[in-house]
Amino acid sequence: MALGALSASIEDANAETQAEQAIFGEPGDPPPGIWHHNVVTAMLEANADVVQLLTSLEQETKITGFSYSTEIIEEQDWVRLTQSQFEPIEITPKLWIVPTWHEAPTQDAINIILDPGLAFGTGSHPTTHLCLAWLSQQSAMHRVLDYGCGSGILAIAAKKLGATEVTGVDIDPQAVIASRYNAENNQVDIQFYDSNAYLHETYDIVVANILSSALMVLAPVIAKSCKTGGKMALSGILETQKEALAQQYSEWFDVDTPVVKDGWVLLTGTKK
C-alpha cells in the first residue's frame, strides 16, 4: 500500500490443493504468519507504472525475481455485480436466508433477512448451515446463547424459531454492531454484548460457530454457560479436529456423533 496500491490482498498460492495451509486469526489475535508460497493481488491506478512498482518492491523486501501478470478491470456497476453473487439460501424448506435485494422464495417459511457485511455468517458456509439446520430441529428453546455471534445469524434464527430469550456475544466490536443492525432488520429483540461485558448466566442452548482453537480454550466458559441437561452445538471445526474437540468437551457434556458437511463438523452434546 505504501507503494501506491489502492488495495492489496495475500492468498495461499496452494489454495484448494493438497498443499493448502489453514491459517486463521481472530480480532486482536492475528494469525502467526503467512503461507510459504503466496499470491499478492494489488489494485492500482490505470496509469500506474507496474515495472517501477516491482523495482521498488524488490528494493524494499530484498526479494527478487517476482513473476507477475496484469489485468485491466473495466468499470462496472459494482453494487449490482456484488448483489448478483448472493442468492437466497435454503437451510430447510421452512428456513431461508434472504438478502434484502431479493424477494423471499416462500412467504410461508421463516426468512432471515441478511446481507453480506462486516462479520462472518451469511448462511453460505457449511458451518453456518450446520448450526442453522440443527437449531431448526430443536423442539423447545427457552434461553439461547450465541457465543461468537459474528453477524448474529444464529441468534436471529433462534429467536425466529421460537426461543424466548436470546443473547449474543463476540470479541469483535464490529460483530456486535453488525449483529444489532441485523437483528433490527429482522425485527427481533436480542441482546448483543462484547464478550468482555458478558455476564456468565446459564442457558438451555449454547451455540458457538468459531475457530476450533478458540473452542478449545473456551470449553470451561461454554460449559459454565450451559445448564445441566442443556444442549451445546459447536462448529468452525475441521474434520481433522473433531476428536480433540470431542475429548475436550466430554468432561462436561455427553457428546453426540459428529455431523460432517464438506469437511466441516458440527459437534453437539448434552450437559451432564
Q: Model features per residue range: what roles?
A:
Residues 118-202:
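Conserved SAM/SAH cofactor-binding pocket of Class I
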Residues 7, 165, 232-233:
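A short hydrophobic/small-residue beta-strand
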Residues 93-95, 142, 230:
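Surface-exposed loop/turn positions
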